[in-house]
Amino acid sequence: VNFQEILKTATSERKLIRAIAYVIKSSNTEEESFFEALDKQGFEVKMKDLQIFMSGVKKADWDVGIAIDAIKMADKLDVVILVTGDGDFAPLITYLQENKGCLVEVIAFGKTTSSKLRELADDFCDLDGNPRYLMSQGKEKMHFFKKSTLKRK
């Protein structure tokens, strides 16, 4: 995924306040260059170690951290953009819209995005079938699908 292109399109003509990449660090040394690339592209990189339990189960969960950060920053933001298709973020979207007056946009691969997330988001951008947002550069534009407009109180 070409995160620089996603960031460029997501911010469009808006002022970027913060772009945070939530990453999981494993023992793979190759990921360091990926994390450095995200940093150079303007992302603040927040990192957690991959947890490996005695049973062999691996867990890497940023859901609560992402939700806390979004809620802490919401009073200073008009728009929150989530790049995820995970339906676990549906309550966060509702909270940001109803309690903080934020517009919430979701950018994700449509085929794997929760239908509830798509329904709740003020705008949804489907990355499926758009080569511009893959590492091979294409020339197509990302399209947001407008659903509704919320005004700040």
Predicted regions and their residues:
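Terminal and domain-boundary accessory regions
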Residues: V1-K153
